[in-house]
Amino acid sequence: MMEYIDISILNPAEYNPRLLTNEAQEDLKKSIKELGIIKPIIIRQSDKRIMAGHQRTKTMKLLGYTHVPAFILDGVNSTDEVRFNQLHNYAECELSEIQPEINVSLPKGTEGFYTVSNKDISILSKGGNNSRVVDLTKMILRYGQFANAICDHTGKVIISTVYAKTVKLLGMDLLVYVLPEGKEEIALKYFSKEYGVFE
């Protein structure tokens, strides 16, 4: 379940391998200014350590945010911490033709975070990435849900489609972020960028 957490109590993980270039930092600032925080970070319950979302947290601090949306997970081992980071970053780069096509039913005028019941999630085409579904399934069953999907105002999922498919197949409800009308291209532009370089 997503919660809003005081950003000042969060601790960065030592293993985070990505460094932000100045250009990427500016792009990330622009995306947050234009879209807001549409993707929660992942933190560890025991010590509030960030497992995924380091660069966005850093940028939110620079922009003056005091609270951040986060999934809080308990009992995560060190191997799975790194795995969460990888899965989280993969969702930023999954914009390809082999993705499943997913629609969700939304009340008219819905914007921002919204929980969609499982019966209101429709898989229109299965796409590929069955191995990714298996990976996501293992992590969700072990720790609970840790991500959201992003959809346009009509309910078409445009980012994190594989995650949405996995949640549907597991019979669970799905947290989505519903973009305001006309913001789809902006979101796709920013999510197709690489925010950070690996050391």
Predicted feature locations:
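Short, charged/polar connector segments at secondary-structure boundaries
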Residues: 1-178, 187, 191-198
